[in-house]
Amino acid sequence: MAGVRVKICGLRTESDVKAAASSGAAYVGLVFFPKSPRHLELAQAQRLALAAPPGVAKVALTVDASDETLDAIVEAVPLDMLQLHGGESPERVAEVRARYGLPVMKAVGVADEGDLPQILEQSLAADQILIDAKPPKGAALPGGNGLSFDWRLISGRHWIRPWMLAGGLTVENLAEAVRRTGASQVDVSSGVESAPGVKDPARIAAFLQAAR
């Protein structure tokens, strides 16, 4: 698995950020979604972003956020990328990208083969694609649910943008996930937690060690 880049998402404390960065994370994800146990207020997120060392990309995750909400986040928090994790259309992705001049990662939920065309559609507007497990109907959260999808659905496929694999990844299944999908980037949140929203430094270190 040499060279797999890792995003640790849903960090809530400065020590979380330091644990991720010191273990070799390429990205740290900050969640702005009040329904999530990983949600951050702006002042808290600003502190976390400032704690990230140079070379670690700071990503803000939002869900169907308004321009007003995004304006406030971008103004308060030093960021390297925006992650849109709701039902945003390719047109909305393009709007956000143009408005802020930041790279945009668009999440696409996958449950079956019928979801795959969205990956190409969103690739036409986004800079990167996050391929995640589609949440069950009625789920409160669009991601971070600890669910995976059938990795065979994307085995051997290629897209026009860099992409990242997410959904139920853990230190135990990471090697198989990468082998089946060919992912060169992965995203983990609940898989390195001791409780919802509570990151475990030992699990973070173990996951990043497994990704090397």
From Swiss-Prot:
Q: Which GO terms describe its molecular function?
A: phosphoribosylanthranilate isomerase activity
Q: What class of enzyme is it?
A: isomerase
Annotated InterPro entries: Aldolase_TIM, PRAI_dom, RibuloseP-bd_barrel, TrpF_fam
What is the protein name given in its UniProt record?
N-(5'-phosphoribosyl)anthranilate isomerase
Q: In which pathway does it act?
A: Amino-acid biosynthesis; L-tryptophan biosynthesis; L-tryptophan from chorismate: step 3/5
Q: Enumerate the UniProt keywords alphabetically.
A: Amino-acid biosynthesis, Aromatic amino acid biosynthesis, Isomerase, Tryptophan biosynthesis
**Species this chain originates from:** Cereibacter sphaeroides (strain ATCC 17023 / DSM 158 / JCM 6121 / CCUG 31486 / LMG 2827 / NBRC 12203 / NCIMB 8253 / ATH 2.4.1.)
Q: Which family does it belong to?
A: Belongs to the TrpF family.
Tell me if tRNA-binding is a UniProt keyword of this record. no
Q: What is its EC number?
A: 5.3.1.24
Catalysed transformations (reactions): N-(5-phospho-beta-D-ribosyl)anthranilate = 1-(2-carboxyphenylamino)-1-deoxy-D-ribulose 5-phosphate
